């Protein structure tokens, strides 16, 4: 009997070890906690489609997603359109609606659990992503561990101050895109946002790429994946998935 229990115990441990080796690491979505467009008083937050469309791609591929925001808790939402079926699917998914409504604070995140960090857009990101040292440290660790750093639209505001162990900025020398100066001008917020994202990324050494207004444009370079605008959100999710498959996370 003792021998049988020992054999069963060894078998269970081996099975669990084998299972753990094949478990996919999670993906961390970052959303803003900021709810106003500067002095305008207009509401903002994370842009729903820039969460839902990448989420759909990665969720259906079997990846578990967690949410973090600078302040934790329920983040403000912008671009709330449930006529978009993907937005509706995300919003009505009880598990993930609960997750985003109870987003973690950066101090609650263990970077080792994640293969990817993705910064969702929405104008609020321009106020609370760039200077958040805790989020930058999380992203740097994920990247240094061989992971992916991604963002869409204003989300790459979170990339501008990420430094690597060698002291260089993450975006230095890499092809990057994000919400463009022309798009910021088109929505008449050039003088409202605290900085122009395109300019700041260039200052950090990024090789900034862009297409015309509201065109889908995604670039992947050395495990950094960025998209230009809301129209690029799904494609960013697809590019992340492709990179994850290449890395076998």
Give a label for each model feature.
Residues 146-150:
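Conserved, well-structured core segments that form or line functional sites
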């Amino acid at each position: 009997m003792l021998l049988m229990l020992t054999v069963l115990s060894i078998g269970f441990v081996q099975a669990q070890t084998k299972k753990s080796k094949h478990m996919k690491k999670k993906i961390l979505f970052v959303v803003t906690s900021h709810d106003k467009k500067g002095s305008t008083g207009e509401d903002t937050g994370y842009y729903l489609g820039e969460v839902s469309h990448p989420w759909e791609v990665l969720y259906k591929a079997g990846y578990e997603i967690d949410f973090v925001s600078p302040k934790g808790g329920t983040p403000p939402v912008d671009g709330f359109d449930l006529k978009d079926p993907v937005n509706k699917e995300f919003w009505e998914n009880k598990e993930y609606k609960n997750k985003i409504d109870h987003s973690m604070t950066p101090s609650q995140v263990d970077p080792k659990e994640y293969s990817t960090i993705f910064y969702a857009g929405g104008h609020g990101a321009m106020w609370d992503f760039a200077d958040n040292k805790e989020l930058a440290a999380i992203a740097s660790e994920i990247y240094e561990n061989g992971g992916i750093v991604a963002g869409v639209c204003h989300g790459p505001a979170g990339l501008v101050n990420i430094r690597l162990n060698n002291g260089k900025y993450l975006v230095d020398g890499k092809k990057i895109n994000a919400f463009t100066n022309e798009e910021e001008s088109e929505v008449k917020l050039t003088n409202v946002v605290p900085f122009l994202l395109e300019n700041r990324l260039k200052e950090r050494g990024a090789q900034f790429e862009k297409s015309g207004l509201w065109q889908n444009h995604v670039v992947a370079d050395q495990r950094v994946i960025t998209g230009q605008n809301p129209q690029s959100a799904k494609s960013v999710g697809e590019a992340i998935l492709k990179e994850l498959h290449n890395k076998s996370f």
